[in-house]
Amino acid sequence: MANPSKAKGTDWEMRVLRFLASYGLDVQRMPPAGSLDVGDLQLTDKDGDRWVIECKATKAIDLAGGMNELRVEQQRAGAPFGALIIKRRNHDTSRGYVVIDLGDFAATVSDEVL
């Protein structure tokens, strides 16, 4: 791969995929689709809900930018949930950061259906 940044991003996506799969989650890597992108990964959780996963392995963390990108990809994919997974420098994959909207968090930990 000629682009070092792309190689780092792809490596992080694969590490996240393998980590999530090790927990028995049904997770797939999505092919790059440019302006029609539907996230880096998609998974189906134990309740059968689909999640769009956007993975970032950058020096500077841009939460707003990453969440905006995730929201567009989530809507495009028609998935009810989304998560931004950010590489934590100098740490194991399991120590990466996961960012989700408060509404998605409440929906996943509550028995209430809104």
Please annotate each region the language model reported.
Residues 1-114:
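Catalytic phosphate/metal-binding cores of nucleic-acid and nucleotide-processing enzymes, i.e., regions
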